[in-house]
């Protein structure tokens, strides 16, 4: 019920559309009209979360994908839907950069947006190469970190920080929502990932 006093509610729960929709139904019952609502989803298309929501909710709803851990990582993707009010988008872009000190990027509402579409593709390609070439976890992280100009957390440590469950949900979402992608099969999880 304290949600009614909030200017901005950011959803940060498991990467499952059904659970997010259930939460937004509860949030809508208690929020004040005009308050901002956003999702920190890593890859679920933003418009899919709006089913059953009021016009006011839809106008004030946007994706705000903060990269994890947000206290260290600069990127913030702002993902409006066609129903998001332009003033909300302008506010989030401005607040994200000037107040939060983030590098804000305006994204289209496509599966996994920009960074995770590229990043998860890269990780999945590497996962398949690991299976084919028999690399160990430590070998992969040595070869896919600073030596390539990437963070020292490299691949497997990054997946551990973000959460392997999140990666699995995003990869599955890409496979499910990118039916015409010529490399769609790359998002099929190797067996060893399911065992981790």
Where are each of the predicted segments found?
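N-terminal glycine-rich phosphate-binding loop for ADP-containing cofactors
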Residues: 1-196
């Amino acid at each position: 019920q304290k949600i009614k006093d909030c200017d901005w509610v950011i959803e940060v729960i498991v990467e499952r559309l059904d659970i997010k929709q259930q939460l937004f139904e509860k949030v809508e019952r208690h929020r004040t009209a005009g308050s901002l609502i956003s999702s920190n989803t890593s890859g679920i298309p933003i418009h899919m979360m709006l089913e059953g929501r009021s016009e006011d909710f839809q106008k004030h709803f946007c994706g705000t994908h903060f990269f994890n851990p947000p206290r260290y990582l600069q990127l913030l993707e702002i993902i409006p839907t066609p129903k998001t009010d332009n003033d909300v988008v302008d506010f989030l872009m401005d607040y994200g950069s000037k107040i939060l000190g983030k590098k804000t990027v305006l994204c289209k509402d496509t599966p996994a947006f920009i960074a995770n579409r590229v990043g998860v593709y890269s990780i999945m390609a590497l996962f398949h190469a690991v299976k084919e070439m028999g690399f160990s976890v430590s070998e992969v992280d040595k070869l896919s970190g600073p030596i390539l100009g990437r963070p020292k957390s490299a691949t497997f440590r990054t997946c551990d920080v973000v959460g392997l469950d999140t990666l699995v949900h995003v990869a599955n979402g890409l496979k499910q929502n990118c039916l015409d992608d010529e490399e769609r099969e790359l998002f099929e999880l190797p067996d060893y990932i399911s065992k981790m």
